[in-house]
Amino acid sequence: VDNKAICLKLLAAESEAAVQAIIDSVPEMSDPANWDAIDERESNFNVVTNQASTGGKAATELMTNMVDAILMRRAFEQGIDPKDRSQAPPNMYKAVDRLIVNLRGGKLVNAEEAWLKDFASKNLIVGITGSRETTRKSKEWPCYTFVDNGEGQHPADFKNTFLSLSARNKSDIPFVQGKYNMGSSGVLSYCGARWFKLIISRRFDATGPWGWTLMRLRPGGGLPVADYFHLAGEIPAIDADALYPLHKNTGERFDGVMLKTGTVVKLYDFRVGEKFKSFRGAREAFNENLTETILPFRIMDFRWSPDKKRGGLRAHGIDARPFYGMEYALRRREDEREEDEDDDEEQAPAGATVAEKFEVGVIDDPTLGKIEITALPMRARADGKDPLPGWLKHTSSNSRVFHAVNGQVQYKQTRGYLSNCGFSGIKDRVAIIIDASQLDEGTHYKLWKGDRENILQNDTGERYLTIVKEIIVQSPSLDDWKQQIAREDLKRIATEDTNDLFQKLVDSDRELIALLDQRDPTLKLPDPKDDDEEFEGKFDPTFFTLGKRFESEPLELPLNKARAFTATTDAVNDFFIRADNQGRLFVSDEKVRARFAIKHILYDGHLTVFFSPADDTIQAGDFFEFELGLVSDSMSRPLTEPVSIKILAEEE
């Protein structure tokens, strides 16, 4: 059997039917003896299908694995043992700074556009080929090819990596995300009726050949089983100096993407979602499931007709776009006008002014770990059109609150949730990101369900959701944004003076009624802050002043309540959430950190720090004294004040 010829034919195939034709034409592939259950489990159906609930979510699992592969390769190349915590980066963001390029906190928003494009085009590509049908009625689906220039695998290692459902290969590696070892198989049930998925890989050091295998749903009736192809128990191997994994819609090889090592995964007739068949739709599906990609991607759609007038890739029928995730799309509008078929509506609409993200609050809980909550506001457009990008409009998505780990969305909450928190007026003017990346490792396993889309309804899940909601409800920054939007809406009512507009706005935000003067039918607008009064903080604070009541008396804290210290400071609003030289809350006594859940909110020079007992050994009458303040790596010393807490009996 000519392994190389078969592999290249499969790579060039652009439909499930074409793959089946290849199988039927090759005696070795038609022989059931050369197919075995993935992970040697005849019951692997339960694992394969009990993962992502949509094709878009499943695809982003693959993209996460691609980023892991790049970081792993760079670690190996620099002589770093990924499992040695004394030398390996402690998280993905620090891994980007140390192993790839210093982005001052590992954030893509700090990178130059030229570097982002160059890195993505050489390392992380998603190609869309095959069917050009984009209507919901069509039964045809495109193919997706995922190409990464990462660590790759030897053929002999496929069974313990790509073909494993249970081996925790990355569980001891602190700077990768794909620790569940299931993300690669989660796409199978979205690959047409036969679950065809091709994997080709070569180890990054080129010390061995390429290996390849094809996965499929076992033909015949009975319990569904996911199989993989082998030859006499061995993964087929081929020799090739370079691999060109993508083809133009004419069938010609595309020379613009080439691998000498790394991994290619091709999904045939991939069902990303009924409304996501178009190129824009694919990017929208990815955006909603990745708040950030950690490393830059390039997505290329090969299904266009060649347009010689436009030149570049469009002359070859290819539309290529950068993809960096939700946060980047909302904060920085990327333009590739020479390649656009239309406006980039998955990003902020043209004419929209997108504000920098702001802090909602930070939680440091000894039983859970650290949680950072930020908001991405969307300001009004000068032309009066909807400021929401298309993929966030409620006709496409109701999701507004995104719980993420290393950029990968684990759980979503809706517009209704924001209304329930008292923010109905901004439910279509903000996206909130709950960054749970710094939760304790044990918390992750107690919090997220195996599908990584839901939260377990146990003590950990209930505690997590409760403290997150408390921070959102208490957020002065969200309240200020709500007031700004209310002023905009009331101004529109007063200016346009139409009953229809008034009714529409009040229907969407019942809180507007409270802002109207009931004694006078004339609308009165709340006075905005004068420009001279706008708060301008400092990168590093120069003062931290405790509220006067705490200068001479302790914070009295019931065992079953949370109570807060208040302070004033000149720290800038993003002191705790910025990527570059992130500030920290200073607590002098580590025993206090270990025994109390601490939540803090900083906004316009006002800092509120909530303490609540989290240790069962704390008793009424206990007394704690320590220093509380602010610190960052660029400050010569922390700014602190002495504080004390007196524990009281539980309150009714």
PLM segments and residue spans:
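Short hinge/gating elements
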Residues: E40-Q51, Y144, I173, T261-E274, ...
